[in-house]
From Swiss-Prot:
One GO CC annotation: extracellular region
Organism of provenance: Micrurus surinamensis
GO biological process terms held by the UniProt record: modulation of receptor activity in another organism
Protein name: Three-finger toxin MS1
Example GO molecular function: toxin activity
Main location: secreted
Organism lineage: Eukaryota, Metazoa, Chordata, Craniata, Vertebrata
Compartment annotation: Secreted
Cystine pairings recorded for this chain: C3-C22, C17-C39, C41-C52, C53-C58
Tissue specificity annotation: Expressed by the venom gland.
Length: 59
């Protein structure tokens, strides 16, 4: 499966992932809203939104 794997401040990149899922985490700090994408579906801290999916480049 192919997932995006970059933060919102970087140009889009992809990675082949064996985990079978992609994620998109979103949170806010002093820099504004931050978006991070990657492989798997990790647990997140309170205040961090996460959405996971299981198709190529889905998040």
């Amino acid at each position: 499966m192919i997932c995006y794997n970059q933060q919102s401040t970087e140009p889009p990149t992809t990675k082949t992932c064996s985990e079978g899922q992609c994620y998109k985490k979103t949170w806010s700090d002093h820099r504004g809203t931050i978006i991070e994408r990657g492989c798997a579906c990790p647990n997140v801290k309170p205040g961090v939104k996460i959405s996971c999916c299981s198709s190529d480049k889905c998040r």
